Amino acid sequence: MKAGIIGLGLMGGSLGLALQEWGRFKSVIGYDHNALHAKLALTLGLVDECVEFEKVLECDVIFLAIPVEGIIACLKKMTSVKKSATIIDLGGAKAQIIHNIPKSIRKNFIAAHPMCGTEFYGPKASVKGLYENALVILCDLEDSGTEQVEIAKEIFLGIKARLIKMKSNEHDTHVAYISHLPHVLSYALANSVLKQNDPEMILSLAGGGFRDMSRLSKSSPLMWKDIFKQNRDNVLEAIKKCEKEIAQAKAWIENNDYESLVEWMAQANKLQEFM
């Protein structure tokens, strides 16, 4: 079998490394609309060969490792794939992608979301072992072909990932809280500091807490714009719930009600019981 990867940034490039190490594919080829990224990916050995988009469509298994809106646009150009082909997307929001799949390739399609990654992006961000022990969420498998489901499972298990099945609407609701909201908060924290009179002085004092909280603000704005747009309603609901918590904490501090504030923080401590 031959594998093709569309998008050779962090997720696609790291996947290329994982598939090559797994060794089940005769070759792993790639395409990136950014010619410099494609050249760099080849230099870094992320894929065996970089080709034109149409050549990737001839592969047995095709991975879409690009921003969510790019995935939707790309799927509309993929109706010429082999009847037996397996198309696997790695997008961070699922419902809109699934809603826009051309009917002729719905059985070919597997909606997957690997819960891994870093704040870095581009081919240079690719790392070996990114998918090892990572949780991969597979959505709406009942609408995918039996053969395609088995191939996808074999691949992800082969690169040492863990699998869970979920409905796409449930996925989008849940990841709004554990993935999308943290990025909103990280961008907000970074901008709050950058808009102060002397941000450099403030940041010179930064320790582990600030670095942990602001790390995600380094993430790709274009990728996250797509995710926020495609999961808009769930992201807004998560922001609303978080705003309510912040407003409550603010009110307790304003009113010198530190007992309530302590109870609130103690309740948050219980999160660690689940992690």
Q: Predicted segment positions?
A:
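Short, structured coil segments at secondary-structure junctions
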Residues: 44-46, 83, 104-105, 159
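Residues at the starts of beta-strands that form the adenosine-phosphate
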Residues: 2, 27, 108, 135, ...
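Interdomain hinge/lid region at the active-site interface
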Residues: 199-268
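NAD(P)+-binding Rossmann beta1-loop-alpha1 motif at the extreme N-terminus of oxidoreductases
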Residues: 1-53, 61
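Short beta->alpha hinge that forms the Motif I/post-I loop of the SAM-binding pocket
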Residues: 33-34, 66, 90-92
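Rossmann-like NAD(P)-binding element
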Residues: 53-82, 86-88
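Internal alpha-helical scaffold of NAD(P)-dependent oxidoreductase catalytic cores
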Residues: 128-215
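Rossmann-like NAD(P)(H) cofactor-binding subdomain of soluble oxidoreductases
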Residues: 74-124
